[in-house]
Amino acid sequence: MTKVAVLKQDGSQAAEIELNDAVFAIEPNNAVITDAVLMQRASLRQGTHAVKNRSAVSGGGRKPWKQKGTGRARAGSIREPQFRGGGIVFGPSPRSYAYRINRKAYQLALKSVLSQKVADNKLVVVDALSFEAPKTQDFKKVLANLSADKKTLVVVDEDNENAILSARNLANVQVMTTKGINVLDVVNADKLVIVQSSIEEIQGGLA
């Protein structure tokens, strides 16, 4: 079992916690991590691109010249693709780029990135994040105490609304509940701060 320090909000050590090696100490699988990141990024694409094909372009209802006798190539509409102002051939249309990878593969990717954070000493476990009221400065001070003043992902309990509201104004801080933890956000974060109770919940879901 891998042991890490559990810190208080002031940065002092409160205790130690044993992490499940099946979740936080596996050999990272870079190929699966890549698959998971690409899947999430594809799902974020809006896919609202669109152009007009010959059926959507206005005009062109009349045959521009007679079929035979002019010496020109036959044409049925001035909105055919070869004409200026005509429709686009095989242009992009609105679509969803979302796709899914297997659940076990995604779980392996999540365990891989969590293990990588532990190996890189970028995981901070805090005993609790409790605030009397939502206040950005208080939250910022706690992150400074935890040496997490760069791009930080904070994972909290479901009911920790004060912590979630306190971090909304901080540009480089993202707060989410345990159920929302995902590969892309963990990869993008420089530091990963997790409340101790959330560690147990993550291990219960992935072990």
Curated annotation (Swiss-Prot):
Q: Name one GO molecular function term.
A: structural constituent of ribosome
Matching entries from Gene3D superfamilies are given as: 3.40.1370.10
Residues covered by region (Disordered): 49-75
GO BP field: translation
Identify the keywords attached in UniProt to this record, alphabetized. Answer: Ribonucleoprotein, Ribosomal protein, RNA-binding, rRNA-binding
Q: Which domain of life is it from?
A: Bacteria
What is a single cellular component term in the Gene Ontology annotation? Answer: ribonucleoprotein complex
Q: Summarize the subunit comment.
A: Part of the 50S ribosomal subunit.
User: Which family does the similarity line name?
Assistant: Belongs to the universal ribosomal protein uL4 family.
Per the entry, what this protein does is: One of the primary rRNA binding proteins, this protein initially binds near the 5'-end of the 23S rRNA. It is important during the early stages of 50S assembly. It makes multiple contacts with different domains of the 23S rRNA in the assembled 50S subunit and ribosome. Forms part of the polypeptide exit tunnel.
Spell out the protein name for this chain. Large ribosomal subunit protein uL4
Species annotation = Leuconostoc mesenteroides subsp. mesenteroides (strain ATCC 8293 / DSM 20343 / BCRC 11652 / CCM 1803 / JCM 6124 / NCDO 523 / NBRC 100496 / NCIMB 8023 / NCTC 12954 / NRRL B-1118 / 37Y)
